[in-house]
Amino acid sequence: MNNPISKWHDVVNLRDYNTLTEILDDHVIFYSPVVYTPQRGKDITLKYLMAASEVFNASNFKYHKEVIHKQHACLEFTLTIEDTDINGIDLISWNDSGLITEFKVFIRPLQGVNIIHKMMGNMLE
């Protein structure tokens, strides 16, 4: 079983979008904290994750905790945007080939969700 989490950290730390493309399954499902419906497929997931990378890396984004069990990982992060301390988690699942099949993002507090919604909206326009 291949674990893509170390490669995911490379994507985040280096903004390595080529590696991001390589570790996403073609049928990956992305769950945004600000969009009700799941986003299905590699292309739309790439758009969301690349936009998030630009928004989050402009701040002091940092992972603090990581729990891995079988083919699932929970990564807790913090960042500060517009003087608002934000924390959240990325829940990541992958298949036997080590390709990410599901990516869920949870963020708190509500003020942080609203800020990220606005900034992500600007990036995705």
For each predicted feature, which ranges?
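Short hydrophobic/aromatic segments of transmembrane alpha-helices and their interfaces
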Residues: M1-N2, V28, E82-D83
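Hydrophobic pocket/interface hotspot
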Residues: T19-T21, V28, G41, T45, ...
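A solvent-exposed, acidic/Ser-Thr-rich amphipathic alpha-helical stretch
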Residues: N18, D25-K70
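Short acidic-aromatic low-complexity motifs
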Residues: N2-I23
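A beta-strand edge to alpha-helix "cap/lid" segment located at domain peripheries
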Residues: M50-E125
